A protein has these predicted regions:
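Secondary-structure boundary motif
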Residues: 24-27, 48
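An N-terminal amphipathic alpha-helical segment
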Residues: 1-25
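Intrinsic-disorder/low-complexity, polar/charged segments enriched in Ser/Thr/Lys/Arg/Asp/Glu/Gln
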Residues: 1, 28-32, 62-64
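Amphipathic, hydrophobic secondary-structure cores in small proteins
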Residues: 16-19, 26-42, 55
């Protein structure tokens, strides 16, 4: 599982870093993202490009997103 931490980065850096990491995922591989806010625009892109994800709100106010490339 790959992991990236984009907490605290100003826009558009979180999206750019997540997108770059997604490009290197193999089918069925998971990317774990730590981010300081819930990235709603990212969800539309993930849905449209064949990824599934699970978002968990963490006790410290951050979010953990597990993203899987479907094929």
């Amino acid at each position: 599982m790959q992991e990236i931490d984009v907490r605290g980065l100003p826009p558009p850096e979180p999206f750019l870093n997540i997108n770059a990491a997604l490009q290197s995922l193999e089918a069925s591989e998971t990317l774990k993202v730590l981010i300081h806010r819930e990235p709603y625009p990212l969800y539309d892109i993930l849905r449209d490009t064949g990824y599934t994800w699970q978002t968990t709100a963490l006790a410290d106010g951050n979010y953990e997103i597990l993203i899987v490339r479907n094929q």
